[in-house]
Each structure stands twice: as C-alpha cells, then as structure tokens.
C-alpha cells in the first residue's frame, strides 16, 4: 500500500490542445520527487487520433476538429458531458506495469458503475469498459520515462451522435452508450467525485488532496 498522496484537479471545460500540451509539459518537467496528479475535466467537441490510428476509421468528421495525438489506441471522440480523467502518475514509483495500470483504471470504472447498479465488464482484447456489449468508457495512455499521461473517458450525459462519424477505437459499428441512457439524468460533478475516490483506492494512494488552480502553469 502506498503511503503518499495524489493531487486531484477538477478543471471544468478545457480545450483539448491546451490540456494535451499541459500534460506533456507536466510529464517532461517532473522529477523523482514530483507528486502524482489526476485531472478531471471535459472537452469541447474533438476527435483525437492515437498513434496507431488509421485514417479509414475517421469516416466523416464534418465540422468537428481532428487532433493527432501521442497516446496509444485509435480514434475516439470527446465532448461536453463526457468525464475525462488524465492520470499523471509515476508508475515506476507505484511499482506497477502498464497492463496492471490499465486493469486498475478499468476496475475503478466498473466499481463506479456498480454504485449506480450498472453491471459493466472489461475485455482483455479491447481496453475499455462495456455494458451489454456497448462501450461506455475508453482508455488511452502514454508512458514516458516511467510516467503516465492521457487516461480515460467516461460517457455520462452527452451527445453520442459524433461517435457514428468514426469507427470508435478502430471497431466498425461499435455501439456506444452512456450513464444517462442507463439510469436517467445524472450530475457529472457527482460522477467525478465518485470516480476520483475509486481511482485513489485502486491505485493505492494513502489519501487525495484537492489542488487549487488550473493548468496555466503547465501550458
């Protein structure tokens, strides 16, 4: 069990490129003594294409911008009403490998959904979390010098139509779902509070601390 804390920033609605650049700066400038952070936020509409992304999976983006990024995985969509969590962790210090990190993130999401009486599962061959065959949460990470960035996206209460403009995560016709469609109206801030607790527990931190301020220092 870890004995140090993790800092959590709740950032609201942030442009994707600004958050991405801040993540990179945070990761590139941290040292062995830097604390780990979890950022919880939402993005305006954007498609992001991972390092393994293939152009054929981007069907008709229309007016929504496409950003080529340095995480793993294929194309996905972010938009308001989707809860995004960026995990800026020293995984070497945590003593876990990438697969174990993915498993713990998935378990956090599954436990979160169980709290709403939603039964969800992970798939060993397709990272993410699924409800009845439909995907409700996506994962995409990057590890640099033993430190992680990027993270997860949970569909809470959003417009799912843009997912039909892509092959989500490279799977043609993959159905997507969201928490609102499963349980009715839901406050995304409540979901964020629950998610942070589950992540802290699964990752083994002694406790969490809320960090004031935004990402301006890292841009």
UniProtKB/Swiss-Prot annotation:
Catalytic reactions on record? octanoyl-[ACP] + L-lysyl-[protein] = N(6)-octanoyl-L-lysyl-[protein] + holo-[ACP] + H(+)
> Where along the sequence does the record put site: Lowers pKa of active site Cys?
135
A GO molecular function annotation here is: lipoyl(octanoyl) transferase activity
Cross-referenced InterPro entries: aa-tRNA-synth_II/BPL/LPL, BPL_LPL_catalytic, Octanoyltransferase, Octanoyltransferase_CS
Enzyme class at the top of the EC tree: transferase
Catalytic site: 169
Q: What does this protein do?
A: Catalyzes the transfer of endogenously produced octanoic acid from octanoyl-acyl-carrier-protein onto the lipoyl domains of lipoate-dependent enzymes. Lipoyl-ACP can also act as a substrate although octanoyl-ACP is likely to be the physiological substrate.
The protein's annotated pathway: Protein modification; protein lipoylation via endogenous pathway; protein N(6)-(lipoyl)lysine from octanoyl-[acyl-carrier-protein]: step 1/2
Among CDD domains, the record links this protein to: LipB
Annotated binding of substrate, by residue: 71-78, 138-140, 151-153
Q: Which GO terms describe its cellular component?
A: cytoplasm
**What protein am I looking at?**
Octanoyltransferase
Q: Where in the cell is it found?
A: Cytoplasm
Tell me what else is known.
In the reaction, the free carboxyl group of octanoic acid is attached via an amide linkage to the epsilon-amino group of a specific lysine residue of lipoyl domains of lipoate-dependent enzymes.
Main localisation, per the record?
Answer: cytoplasm
Q: Where is the BPL/LPL catalytic domain?
A: 32-207
The record's keywords, sorted A to Z, are: Acyltransferase, Cytoplasm, Transferase
Q: Known SUPFAM superfamilies for this protein?
A: Class II aaRS and biotin synthetases
| Superkingdom, natural source | Bacteria
């Amino acid at each position: 069990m870890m004995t140090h804390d993790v800092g959590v920033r709740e950032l609201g609605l942030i442009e994707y490129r600004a958050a991405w650049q801040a993540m990179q700066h945070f990761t590139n400038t941290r040292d062995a003594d830097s604390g780990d952070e979890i950022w919880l936020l939402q993005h305006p509409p954007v498609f992001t294409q991972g390092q393994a992304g293939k152009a054929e999976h981007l069907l008709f983006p229309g007016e929504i911008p496409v950003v080529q990024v340095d995480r793993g995985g294929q194309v996905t969509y972010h938009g308001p009403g989707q809860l995004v969590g960026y995990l800026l962790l020293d995984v070497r210090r945590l003593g876990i490998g990438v697969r174990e990190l993915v498993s713990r993130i998935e378990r956090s999401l599954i436990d979160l959904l169980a709290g709403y009486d939603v039964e969800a599962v992970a798939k060993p061959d397709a990272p993410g979390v699924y409800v009845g065959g439909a995907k409700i949460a996506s994962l995409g990470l990057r590890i640099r010098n033993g430190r992680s960035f990027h993270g997860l996206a949970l569909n809470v209460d959003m417009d799912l139509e843009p997912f039909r403009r892509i092959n989500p995560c490279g799977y043609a016709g993959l159905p997507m779902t969201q928490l609102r469609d499963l349980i009715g109206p839901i406050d995304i801030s409540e979901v964020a509070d629950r998610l942070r607790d589950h992540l802290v527990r699964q990752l083994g931190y002694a406790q969490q601390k809320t960090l004031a301020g935004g990402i301006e220092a890292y841009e």
